[in-house]
């Protein structure tokens, strides 16, 4: 048939067409023909018609029944059930009425405590302690031995006066030191014999004076 013989030369030309493509010279003939076939398949795939109809949403039977039940008007039995008044619940507790406030009741008066006046402890404040002078001891050493500040002795030495009783201590002399509750030296007496004593007292400014 003439049509068959005309188609065969055309197919042969198409089959050998890749041999004339210079940019495919590095590839073997079979690879060239494979590339041409793949290109033809892609073109045919693009040209085929596609199904553009959107997928219709699937409505379940339950959704249809819900829509139908909502669209129907309520029956008389449903309306009667809504109009029935609820019965009292026995579990509900009735509100408790507040107790009335009785007038005339005396208010509770707070208890008052009597505060006692401050009484200073005379047994601790201004307490005198007696010390006997040992051989070779000075007044400053006597203070140090009993944990008292020697600076008080130096302050009293500035007003020592006649006879210098602080500097001329004798063995066996009796010395009395007075301290307040805080342990501060507030007075000092030295027995000078013949029932006579020398007295030093502290002033409010911290200095000492010889009282007698």
UniProtKB/Swiss-Prot annotation:
Annotated GO CC locations: plasma membrane
Comment field (misc): Overproduction causes cells to filament, most likely by disrupting FtsZ ring assembly.
BP term (GO), one: FtsZ-dependent cytokinesis
UniProt KW NADP keyword: no
Mutant phenotype after disruption: Deletion of the gene has no discernible impact on morphology or cell size. YtfB/dedD double mutant grows as filamentous cells.
Organism in which the protein naturally occurs: Escherichia coli (strain K12)
Record protein name field: Cell division protein YtfB
Bias kind Low complexity: ranges: 99-120
Gene Ontology terms, MF aspect: metalloendopeptidase activity; peptidoglycan binding
Protein family (similarity comment): Belongs to the OapA family.
Lineage: Bacteria, Pseudomonadati, Pseudomonadota, Gammaproteobacteria, Enterobacterales
GN (gene name): ytfB
Disordered as annotated region, ranges: 88-127
Signal peptide: none
Topology relative to the membrane: Single-pass membrane protein
Domain notes: The OapA domain binds peptidoglycan.
Keywords, sorted A to Z: Cell cycle, Cell division, Cell inner membrane, Cell membrane, Membrane, Transmembrane, Transmembrane helix
Protein location: Cell inner membrane
Parts of the chain that traverse the membrane: 34-50
């Amino acid at each position: 048939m003439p049509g068959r013989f005309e188609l065969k030369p055309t197919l042969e030309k198409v089959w050998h067409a890749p041999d004339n493509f210079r940019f495919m010279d590095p590839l073997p003939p079979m690879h060239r023909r494979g590339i041409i076939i793949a290109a033809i398949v892609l073109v045919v795939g693009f040209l085929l018609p596609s199904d553009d109809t959107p997928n219709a949403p699937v409505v379940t039977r339950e959704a249809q029944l819900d829509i139908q039940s909502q669209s129907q008007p309520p029956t008389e039995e449903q309306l009667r059930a809504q109009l029935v008044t609820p019965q009292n619940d026995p579990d509900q507790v009735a509100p408790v009425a507040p107790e009335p406030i009785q007038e005339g009741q005396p208010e509770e008066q707070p208890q008052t405590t009597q505060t006692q006046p401050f009484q200073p402890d005379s047994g601790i404040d201004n307490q005198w302690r007696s010390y006997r002078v040992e051989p070779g001891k000075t007044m400053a050493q006597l203070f140090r031995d009993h944990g008292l500040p020697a600076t008080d002795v130096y302050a009293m030495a500035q007003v020592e006066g006649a006879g210098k009783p602080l500097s001329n201590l004798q063995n066996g002399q009796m010395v009395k030191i007075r301290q307040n509750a805080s342990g501060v030296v507030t007075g000092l007496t030295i027995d000078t014999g013949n029932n006579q004593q020398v007295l030093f007292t502290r002033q409010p400014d911290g200095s000492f004076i010889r009282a007698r």
